[in-house]
Structures are given as structure tokens and as C-alpha cells.
Amino acid sequence: MSSESDTDTEDEIARERLIELASDFYDQFAEGEVPTMEIPTRTKSNIVFDEDKDVWVYGDRTSTRSANSVRGAQKLLKAIYTIEFLADQLEQGRSSTLRELYYLSESWDEERAQFNDQDESNQLVEDLEIVSKVTREDFHMRPEESGATIMGPLYLREQTRRGEREIHCQKDVGEGGYQIPNNPDTIEFLDNDADFVLCVETGGMRDRLVENGFDEEHNVIIVHLKGQPARATRRITKRLHDDLDLPVVVFCDGDPWSYRIYASVAYGSIKSAHLSEYLATPEAEYIGIQPADIVEYDLPTDPLSDSDINALESELDDPRFQDDYWREQIELQLDIGKKAEQQALASRGLDFVTETYLPERLGEMGVL
């Protein structure tokens, strides 16, 4: 966990990096050059596997933000205004949400520096992360709360604006669990009795596991991903693995979009490939729902849509799914033409998932 002095130092480093970026633009102007900012091309074709770190990162192809056109000049103008805002925010020890940044731009005196929509401001913050090698959390920027939670035998200390507080993520929380903060690096893990971490996609399945006492019976920390996981959720999952040496397994629906949820936990996402080493847990394993489970348990299903089929075919070429296991499962799913939700396991009874399915799969994987 970061102490107050460590936090001050991190803020100073982040602010210095931002000022260096602004100085680079100024120097280019002073030398009579057209100002530019170079960033990696954020496409699937520019993702490569870093064998040393076991995560997917951006390759060598880059895109250049240049002031040699009106559109390019406006992008750099917006970058300068955003850098100034973030540097001032750090100096004042304040924070803001990504949504607030979008609206705050409407008060800037230069109309051409204002954002057209929040996607534009979000992308600019990501660009600044990449070129400065500082995370948005260090800029004191945060998303809207994701609502993702933890439930399990974990005792931690959290740093808040009101001081420190110590929490047991079973005994000191309600059925909803402990809500993951925007910056999990403010958490210190004090003690735990956990044997592994189970990341669960849907709220319904997470609630079923908690109601059935799965976390207590098997000494598991249940992380609710809440769909596509927020960065904070992926970061705390990585910390649970790295800091506590706990195995991580991911439990999702059986469809192509859920496989991508797993991939973002394990290997990172295209959007945040520059942070894969910080967010991804390459040792994480996929427990299900597998296409093979759909066949074996004769689960209730829905037919694959055209977009599902296209997504599965795309995943056959996705570098994150390039192994025999995923090729076999994806080809099987294309062959049967079906998908299933986690909660389809309830067709065999409300206790089937905790008494049979998960224990058997975890046993096969060597976790239990």
C-alpha cells in the first residue's frame, strides 16, 4: 500500500511527466518544427506477445498526431489544455472523473479545445498515459464507480480521505461484499485464509455462490467482474495473484463476448495494451462455461447470432486465443451453433454449480 509520502512522490512524478510533454510541444514550436505526438497504433493487428512478461502488448506500428492539419492541430490543442488541467489537479491534490473532464472542457476559454464527446476525452487520457508512461490513476483521474466487489477470507487495510480502515471481506461486509476502490494500490493485504481467487462475470451467479456459502466452504475470494471488468477489478485480481500467490480462475458465460472478458483478465485488452503488465494476470485460467459443458450437461441454450459467429471466427485469429484448447472449444461452438449462460446450470438445480460443476472443474484444473 502507498504511504502518504509515497503518494506525494508519485504525484510529483506524474506532474513532471505531463510538464515534460508540454515542454516537448513548446520546443518543437521554438525550433520551427510542426508539433507531433507519436503513439502506438491501437488495433488487433498491432498486438504482439511479450514472451518475457507473458502478456499482449502493442507492437512497433505507430500513429502520429501532427499539427500539420486543422484536425491534427485541434487534437494537440486539446492535449495541451488537458495536460494543464491534470497538472493543476495534481498540484492541488484533487481528483476528478473522466465524465467531469468532458464537461469541464466546456469552460475552457478556447472553444476549439473543448471535447465533442466523452469518447474523445477518454481516448486523449489514454494517449497521455501511453506517451507519459503514467497511469490515469496517477493523474488522479477515475471512471464512474463500476460497483465490482470482493467476497472472501481476506483482511485488508484501505487508505481513504478519512484515514485508514481495516476490513474483513466476509465478517465486516454485507451480502454485497467489499466494493473495489478506484485505485486498488491504496489497499494493503493484512491476512487471508484463501486457497484461490474465482472471478465471476455475472451478478446472478456471484449471488448464487455467496448464498450457497461457496466462499466459506472452499476458502475462495470471489471477485465479481460485473461484465467487462474495470481496470480496478483487473488490477486487484493481479495483486491477489502476485502479492498473495493465489491461483486465479475465471467463470463466465459460454459465448464469444465472455471469452473476451476472460482474455482481458489474463492477457489484457487492445484498448489498454500499454498497461498489460500492470493489469493482466497471464496465469489466470478459464473454468467455464465451455462449449464442451453445453454438450456434456445438455444445458439450455440460445442459437448463435450472426454477430456471435463473426466474433468466434475473429477469435480464431486473435493472438490471445492461439492455443489448442481455445481452438478446440471455439470450433466446437461453431459446430453446435449454440451458446449458454452461467445460470443455465440451474437447470440441474440451484446447488449443482457449487456442489458438482465447480468442484469437478476445479479438481480437473488442479485447484481443488
Swiss-Prot record:
This protein's UniProt keywords: ATP-binding, DNA-binding, Isomerase, Magnesium, Metal-binding, Nucleotide-binding, Topoisomerase
UniProt-listed Enzyme Commission number(s): 5.6.2.2
Domain (Topo IIA-type catalytic): residue spans on this chain: 9-148
Cofactor(s) listed: Mg(2+)
Gene3D superfamilies in the record: 3.40.1360.10, Winged helix-like DNA-binding domain superfamily/Winged helix DNA-binding domain
GO terms (BP aspect): DNA topological change
Similarity-based family: Belongs to the TOP6A family.
Assembly description: Homodimer. Heterotetramer of two Top6A and two Top6B chains.
Name used for this protein in its record: Type 2 DNA topoisomerase 6 subunit A
